[in-house]
Curated annotation (Swiss-Prot):
It is found in: Cytoplasm. Homodimer. This is Proline--tRNA ligase. One of its GO terms (biological process) is prolyl-tRNA aminoacylation. It comes from the Bacteria. It catalyses: tRNA(Pro) + L-proline + ATP = L-prolyl-tRNA(Pro) + AMP + diphosphate. One of its GO terms (molecular function) is proline-tRNA ligase activity. The keyword Cell membrane does not apply. It is an enzyme of class 6 (ligase). Coiled coil: none annotated. It comes from Frankia alni (strain DSM 45986 / CECT 9034 / ACN14a).
Length: 468
């Protein structure tokens, strides 16, 4: 009997199987909540560490703001509260008494951080103010799916204030490119389309939203990260102003941007196969698993010796010598968990002076001299990283069609992405597509870049797809 449902047979069921068998997550007791198991959290910690370093390289610093937000804060920005109202969790009783003012459980923090940006911004010398926080947020989800849509999830959200529109726009763009696109491409090995959201799809209260859209294994789109230009909407609502170099008062220009545990779901669906996860080596909590073929003292000792050499080479290594589990069961476990390379150590191999290296992405095996194993594995990991990206890119290219009518776009988007000039779609065509559960994922320049500010929308290409 197969361990996992085949992706071709039932992709959603396969996804649930991977979550369970790879021990990534489980459903919480309240509908829409999620328990992230240790292995799933280890993957998230690796994501956090890399993204956090990129955010800090872009000049932002970490802070933390309250989970509870006065309801009146959200009402200050009308478009923002309207966009989030259906998803809000509101607390009306505290300490057994009805609260004087209801408080909202944080759905995002533009409002409460805006309150403090106003407090901390007095002069142009205080700007730019670049903040990030790692937190949980709550958005009541009617159709939950672990990692993809949950009522509570983990994320980072950045919030910045700037002296002028150009500086704010440039920073939001920098985050979209240097933090999100580069991380998704270089670490998660997921090639993403990057562009701007349409008026209908942009973040509530934003003047512009940039998005990274990945194609999953079933051809659907997943929004992986977003970066928003907020104009002066929140600055006006929260009085974020400053004394300029000219001696006059000016409103600040603000941005916000975020990525979440949804990226874990994207990792599963972009790279997973019928044997389970396939984790890119740059991300993998364990890059190499060393498997003794037999529960033999000499073989296990040699396996630990090999693991020590690989650890000394700077790799993240695990020895799986669990007694009571067959070699085949341990191989299956390593495959389901997506460990990029396994080193199989058996008595026959050792007698010949070899070990066997196995790539998780291709299942290709190679016998290598024992003395060369520690030197060979790092290069093999690089090959796995490149191979996963190449495979994901090939899938995206094979399932992305250039079309010239809305009808053809709708047909192509049943199994992948459709690219079509925006002037042939427009807001009227976008509304028609929504009737078939299709959305415009983003607008791009013809060469696939983020559209320039003030450009003619008729010159842009839009990407249409089904989405998660």
């Amino acid at each position: 009997m197969a361990v996992l449902t085949s992706r071709a047979t039932d992709f959603p069921r396969w996804y649930q199987d991977v979550l369970a068998k790879a021990e990534l997550a489980d459903n919480g007791p309240v509908r829409g909540t999620m328990v992230i198991r240790p292995y799933g959290y280890a993957i998230w910690e690796r994501m956090q560490a890399d993204v956090d370093a990129r955010i800090k390289a872009a000049g932002a610093v970490n802070a933390y703001f309250p989970l509870f937000i006065p309801e009146s804060y959200l009402r200050r920005e009308a478009e923002h509260v309207e966009g989030f109202s259906p998803e809000l969790a509101v607390v009306t009783i505290g300490g057994g008494k009805e609260l004087e003012e209801p408080v909202v459980v944080r759905p995002t923090s533009e409002t409460i951080i805006g309150e403090y940006l106003a407090k901390w911004t007095q002069s142009y010398r205080d700007l730019p103010l670049l903040l990030n926080q790692w937190a949980n947020v709550v958005r009541w989800e009617l159709r939950p799916r672990l990692f993809l849509r949950s009522s509570e999830f983990l994320w980072q959200e950045g919030h910045t204030a700037h002296v002028d529109e150009a500086e704010a726009a440039a920073y939001a763009r920098r985050i979209a490119l240097e933090v999100y696109r580069d991380f998704l491409t270089d670490v998660l090995a997921i090639p993403v389309f990057i562009g701007t959201k349409t008026r209908k799809e942009r973040f509530a209260g934003a003047t512009n939203t940039m998005t990274c859209e990945g194609m999953m294994g079933d051809g659907k789109a997943l929004q992986m990260a977003t970066s928003h230009e907020l104009g002066q909407n929140f600055a006006r609502a929260f009085d974020i102003d400053f004394l300029g170099a000219d001696g006059a008062k000016h409103l600040a220009w603000t941005t916000s941007w975020g990525s979440s545990t949804r990226m874990v779901g994207g990792l599963i669906m972009a790279h997973g196969d019928d044997n389970g996860l396939r984790i890119p080596p740059r991300l993998a909590p364990t890059q190499v698993v060393v498997l003794p073929v037999r529960d033999d003292e000499t073989v296990v000792a040699k396996a630990r010796e090999i693991a020590a050499a690989l650890t000394d080479a700077g790799l993240r290594v695990q020895v799986d010598a669990r007694s009571g589990l067959s070699f085949g069961r341990r191989v299956t476990d390593a495959e389901i968990k997506g460990i990029p390379v396994r080193v199989e150590v058996g008595p026959r191999d050792l007698a010949a002076g070899n070990v066997t290296l196995v790539r998780r992405d291709t299942s290709v095996k190679a016998a290598v001299p024992l003395a060369e194993a520690a030197a060979r594995v790092p290069a093999l990991l690089d090959e796995v990283q490149a191979g996963l990206h190449a495979e994901a890119l090939a899938l995206r290219e094979s399932r992305t069609a250039d079309v010239t009518t809305v009808a053809d776009a709708a047909a192509a988007a049943q199994t992948g992405f459709a690219r079509i000039p925006w002037r042939l779609v427009g807001e009227e065509g976008e509304a028609r597509l929504a009737e078939d559960a299709l959305t415009v994922r983003c607008l791009q320049t013809p060469d696939g870049e983020i559209p320039p500010a003030g450009g003619d929308p008729d010159d842009l290409i839009c990407l249409i797809a089904r989405s998660y």
